């Protein structure tokens, strides 16, 4: 295999590993709790450690397919959807998503992170999807992709969260996109809004069912300010420049995040991958410079 192809394959592999580590790190419940506190009105002003208790089961990371007809798993013969739906206090609701085809359907596009959250009333639930992007995509508009994802999550509820025409049982959905390497730190909430054009009739319905949150993270670590609480945490977690101890220090001292073995391990592994990617990029740059120099000398001699 050509050396340049080998390097490209290795770089792609490391990028993929980095992406998976980023998702795994974001998938820790305490990190998700900080995201919820800073993006969802009902959880504002709450202690993230309390919010952790509202996250049901374990979040699914790179498991649930986005593709039409694949988001839900097949029900077994004899399953009674009505009986399952009547038990609104079950904490295993997310298990009805399709987790069975991760190997059979390898290569399929999957949600980065998806999970259910029980609201403070103890009865209602919302569905949260978190997506991580290394930068704003160039091939497509990020909002368009977010709309596609959230529509898939909403439509997949039929047969899982509601049956027949009981659309009032649909759950509110938040699709939260974290976009790195932006020019500035930002936070946007994209949602439905009614506009009266003729008359004043009030149509019944829940306009808050679809919510897209886009979090822009700049390259620089933001100052320690209240408005940048979430941005500083995410920036520290996902930074390719900060050292392991600097990241852990911010997490522990500023955010009171318990540095358990698994989260400490994920931070270290991600930093190691970042270092490897930087070193390969540096070597590639040096090699390119050497080749350019050789070519110039050759032309000069001729």
Kindly give the residue locations of the regions a language model identified.
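Elongated, amphipathic alpha-helical interaction scaffolds
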Residues: 1-302
């Amino acid at each position: 295999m050509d050396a340049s192809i080998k390097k490209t394959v290795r770089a792609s592999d490391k990028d993929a590993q980095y992406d998976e580590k980023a998702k795994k790190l974001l998938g820790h419940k305490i990190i998700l709790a900080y995201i919820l506190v800073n993006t969802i009105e009902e959880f504002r002003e709450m202690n993230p450690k309390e919010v952790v208790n509202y996250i049901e089961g374990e979040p699914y990371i790179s498991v649930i397919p986005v593709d039409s007809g694949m988001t839900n798993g097949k029900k077994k013969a004899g399953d009674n959807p009505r009986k399952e739906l009547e038990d609104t206090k079950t904490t295993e609701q997310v298990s009805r998503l399709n987790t069975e085809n991760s190997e059979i359907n390898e290569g399929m596009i999957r949600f980065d992170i998806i999970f259910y959250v029980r609201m403070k009333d103890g009865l209602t639930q919302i569905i949260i999807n978190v997506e991580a992007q290394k930068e704003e995509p160039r091939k497509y508009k990020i909002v368009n992709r977010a709309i596609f994802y959230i529509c898939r999550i909403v439509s997949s509820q039929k047969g899982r969260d509601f049956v027949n025409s009981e659309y009032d049982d649909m759950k509110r959905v938040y699709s939260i996109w974290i976009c790195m390497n932006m020019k500035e730190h930002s936070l946007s909430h994209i949602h439905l809004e009614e506009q009266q054009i003729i008359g004043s009739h009030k149509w019944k319905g829940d306009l808050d069912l679809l919510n897209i949150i886009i979090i822009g993270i700049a390259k620089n670590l933001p100052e320690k300010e209240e408005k940048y609480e979430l941005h500083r945490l995410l920036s520290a977690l996902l930074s390719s420049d900060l050292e392991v101890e600097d990241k852990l220090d911010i997490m522990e001292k500023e955010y009171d995040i318990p540095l358990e073995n698994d989260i400490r391990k994920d931070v270290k592994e991600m930093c190691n991958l970042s270092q490897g990617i930087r070193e390969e990029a540096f070597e590639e740059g040096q090699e390119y410079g050497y080749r350019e120099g050789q070519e110039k000398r050759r032309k000069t001699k001729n």
